[in-house]
Amino acid sequence: MSLTNEQIIEAIASKTVTEIVELISAMEEKFGVSAAAAAVAVAAGPAEVAEEKTEFDVVLAEAGANKVAVIKAVRGATGLGLKEAKDLVESAPANLKEGISKAEAEALKKELEEAGAKVEIK
């Protein structure tokens, strides 16, 4: 049975942010591509090409008012236990994940901000 584009979009829309990030990673591995948009920089003077950053760090800047929701989001994103996630959230600013793709970093930032945290991508 062949799925239509509409069915695929509906299936993706029903997934959580974490599941979508995992799907993107699996697709990148399967097809040997990157979801990050390729940027071409043309220099006016000498032939110098600016390198686009491909690895990003997600930093929890502040837990916000709803620490419980942030701890749950951190646990889901990192796989840490309850105590480790709580300690990480309370020690903000703290690195949550390092060396991840831009798409994964953006998805994680969105998920944590929805829980009430202040997040930075570096």
UniProtKB/Swiss-Prot annotation:
Keyword Protein biosynthesis: no
Family annotation (Pfam families): Ribosomal_L12, Ribosomal_L12_N
Annotated GO biological process: translation
UniProt keyword terms in alphabetical order: Ribonucleoprotein, Ribosomal protein
Transmembrane domains' residue ranges: none
InterPro entries: Ribosomal_bL12, Ribosomal_bL12_C, Ribosomal_bL12_C/ClpS-like, Ribosomal_bL12_oligo, Ribosomal_bL12_oligo_N_sf
Any one of the GO CC terms: cytosolic large ribosomal subunit
Molecular function per GO: mRNA binding; structural constituent of ribosome
Record bears the keyword Disulfide bond: no
Annotated function: Forms part of the ribosomal stalk which helps the ribosome interact with GTP-bound translation factors. Is thus essential for accurate translation.
PANTHER family per record: 39S RIBOSOMAL PROTEIN L12 (PTHR45987), LARGE RIBOSOMAL SUBUNIT PROTEIN BL12M (PTHR45987:SF4)
UniProt record similarity statement: Belongs to the bacterial ribosomal protein bL12 family.
Name this polypeptide is given: Large ribosomal subunit protein bL12
Species for this entry: Histophilus somni (strain 2336)
